[in-house]
Amino acid sequence: MDASALKSKTDDSSRKFIYTTAFLAALLPEYIAPLLTLAGFVVFKRRYSLTSQKVRLGTVGKVFLAFMCYSLLSSLWSLTPLYSAAISLLWMGMLLGSFMVSNLVVKKSQLETLVTAFSLGGGAVGGIGLLQYVVLMLKGHILNPLWGFFDKIIYELMPFDITYTATVWEKSRAASTFDNPLICATYLIMILPIAVYGFISGEKKHRRLCGISAVLILGGIAGTTSRGAALAVTASLVVLLFINSKKALSIFVTILASAGIFILGIVKRNEILEFDLEKSTDSRLKMWEACFKSISERPLIGFGAGCESTAQRMAEFGVRRPHAHSLYIEMASELGILGLLFLFVVFGFIIYDIIKLIKLGDGWGKLGIAFLAIFIGFAVISLTEFTLQTPKELQYFMLVLGMLEATKRMAIENKTEYGKERKELLKEKTPKEYTPV
């Protein structure tokens, strides 16, 4: 088999892993889903080596990897060194998915297939969540989270003690295939703009599937009855208004309908739990107060990667929670102000790439708006939730980053090729200089 045939076979088999992971991982338990990324990368790297190809790393990937190295270094001063090292290595492992996507998705058709895979996976998760919520509202019984009983067994077998305990029976909010409703909401918020893009601007044969998936995703988010998720999805949908002016009205109606569903869901949840907004806010404030006291004791470098160190510190101040319920406060607690600033640098490069993609215009600009909606939704929900906590959250965040890098490369190459073709065309049309005989 010649080099080009081997390369084609290599890329095709590795891409199947990407599509499978994008669709299936969200439906699997937290301790199984990451294996898809790791197995896919092993196949990808091994076959890449056979063809003497080099893995290209984008700027975001390089900076993020540097951040993770700092995170791993924090295990030297961590309150929970083994846990910190394990969490840092998990982040690095999931980053491999980003490299795989950005190197293998090199054509628009492949990108559209990936969009569909993400959308269908999100639709399945949202559909399960919506079903759970409806059954709970009807006072019925249903597995919620879907893998809760297995989660409890697995977490008890961990080689180190952890504060987090698996939720076996969530009585009022949908968790779908995730550990709890807030983690589910974070995932769905990342996938919603992709599904909306697929419905509005994707391949015609997949638009209906993406549209149905988007509706199910919204239903799943509503089923979590999370106020933070409601705010995040609203911000995300507002950005998506700019993706297509002809369909802006339908998106606006969707925003209003979603707002109504969220309000009804939250009111119903409060009735069931006798749990009001004031009590919820007070709980968050107590957590954050404990975290700020902790951060003030070691402001620069924190207490080590992983939320277990934060949980231990909060417990010392009389607050028993598994993490800070805010990505930004959690990072400051784990890795100090230096780590938080490092994370903001990573986010800065992500925003730069998104803006660059939007400026390239054409169909690429629409995808850029979808990525902007993802990032804004993620940034908003991160204010009140620790959004990079679990393996699946990390896995999908990295896969989406890989998709952004792949899209940016394709857009730049497409623009460059168009520029070359235009120059050649202009050269042909320029009248040749008359040379007298």
Feature map (PLM): residue ranges:
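Long extracytoplasmic/lumenal interhelical loops at the membrane interface
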Residues: S172, K268-L335, K359
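Hydrophobic transmembrane alpha-helices and their immediate junctions
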Residues: R46-Y48, F199, H206-C210, T234-L237, ...
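Alpha-helical transmembrane segments of multi-pass inner-membrane proteins
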Residues: T21-A22, A39-F41, L72, L96, ...
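A conserved mid-to-late transmembrane alpha helix and its immediate loop/hinge
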Residues: S176, N180, L218, E289, ...
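A membrane-periplasm/extracellular boundary helix in multi-pass inner-membrane enzymes
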Residues: L76, G127, L131-K139, I221-T224, ...
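Membrane-embedded alpha-helical segments of multi-pass membrane proteins
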Residues: L28-R47, S88-G97, C184-L192, A230-V238, ...
